[in-house]
């Protein structure tokens, strides 16, 4: 099973239990390595505490133990999205129009995979980012990773 299919299956599997606890499932990442990690990002209107993460971890662990979708050993991490919030869906980009974002593409555009710019617009599955005064349009399916860039 390829990584995006696994992440999609995991998202479908744990969305309801996370929502039942009163949290939004922001997204998940599965990082394959010698010590693989399943990272789950949650949020709520009141913010996220360590106890919230522990509650979700306990609930999700129970679901994953029964369903057993991951065939390798892994560590489970549950956290808030944090200041460098990852963006997973078109709705996330739409919510953060006007914010600076760092994007890594699956396939290079204009010989570049890494882009830094401001989210300008979202049209279906197409994301427009203003980079150095020029609008660049990327398919959401070509975005491997995107994070907000915090300013202090």
UniProtKB/Swiss-Prot annotation:
The answer to keyword 4Fe-4S applying to this record is no
Q: Can you say where in the cell this protein is located?
A: Cytoplasm
GO CC annotation: what is one? cytosol
| GO BP of this protein | ribosomal small subunit assembly; translation
InterPro entries according to UniProt: Ribosome_maturation_RimP (IPR003728), RimP_C (IPR028998), RimP_C_sf (IPR036847), RimP_N (IPR028989), RimP_N_sf (IPR035956)
Q: Which UniProt keywords apply?
A: Cytoplasm, Ribosome biogenesis
Q: What Pfam families does its record include?
A: DUF150_C, RimP_N
Its main subcellular localisation, reduced to a broad class, is: cytoplasm
Q: What does this protein do?
A: Required for maturation of 30S ribosomal subunits.
HAMAP family, alphabetically? Answer: RimP
Instruction: State the family named in the UniProt similarity comment for this chain.
Output: Belongs to the RimP family.
List the protein's name.
Answer: Ribosome maturation factor RimP
Q: Which organism is it from?
A: Pectobacterium atrosepticum (strain SCRI 1043 / ATCC BAA-672) (Erwinia carotovora subsp. atroseptica)
């Amino acid at each position: 099973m390829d990584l995006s299919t696994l992440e999609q299956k995991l998202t479908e599997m744990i969305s309801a239990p996370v929502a039942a606890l009163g949290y939004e499932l922001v997204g998940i990442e599965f990082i394959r390595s010698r010590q693989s990690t399943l990272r789950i990002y949650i949020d709520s209107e009141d913010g996220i505490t360590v106890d919230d993460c522990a509650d979700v971890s306990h609930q999700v662990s129970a679901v994953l133990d029964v369903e057993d979708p991951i065939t390798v050993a892994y560590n489970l991490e549950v956290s808030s999205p944090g200041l460098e919030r990852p963006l997973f869906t078109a709705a996330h980009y739409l919510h953060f129009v006007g914010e600076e974002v760092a994007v890594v593409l699956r396939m290079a555009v204009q010989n570049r995979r890494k882009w830094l710019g401001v989210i300008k617009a979202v049209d279906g599955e197409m994301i427009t980012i203003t980079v150095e005064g020029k609008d660049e349009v990327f398919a959401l399916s070509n975005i491997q990773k995107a994070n907000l860039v915090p300013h202090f």
